[in-house]
């Protein structure tokens, strides 16, 4: 006769995969039209000039240029894409 009961399987021990959120491009980096700049949940970053806001709050470039981060109000960080003559092809 066994002195220990058979060990049952654990009800824990699983997790979902990460959602790959966050910055995809940083300040000063060159982007093409359509490039994703930030993937986020909610609006941690707000769209500025030449960027779009997707339905899942993804910020993406509408034109080719350089990424620029700036603050307008105290707690709001905006992201714009500055069209540079040297980057225009």
UniProtKB/Swiss-Prot annotation:
One of its GO terms (molecular function) is structural constituent of ribosome. GO terms for biological process: translation. The keyword Ribonucleoprotein applies. Transmembrane segments: none annotated. InterPro entries: Ribosomal_bL27. Residues 1-26 are annotated as: Disordered. Pfam families: Ribosomal_L27 (PF01016). It comes from the Bacteria. SUPFAM superfamilies: Ribosomal L27 protein-like (SSF110324). Gene3D superfamilies: 2.40.50.100. GO terms for cellular component: ribonucleoprotein complex; ribosome. Keywords: Ribonucleoprotein, Ribosomal protein. Belongs to the bacterial ribosomal protein bL27 family. This is Large ribosomal subunit protein bL27.
């Amino acid at each position: 006769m066994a002195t220990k009961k058979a060990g049952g399987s654990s009800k824990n021990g699983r997790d979902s995969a990460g959602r790959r959120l966050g910055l995809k491009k940083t300040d000063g980096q060159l982007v093409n039209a359509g490039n994703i700049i930030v993937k986020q949940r909610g609006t941690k970053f707000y769209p500025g000039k030449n960027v779009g806001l997707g339905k899942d709050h993804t910020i993406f470039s509408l034109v080719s240029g350089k990424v620029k981060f700036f603050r307008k109000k105290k707690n709001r960080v905006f992201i714009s894409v500055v069209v540079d003559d040297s980057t225009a092809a």
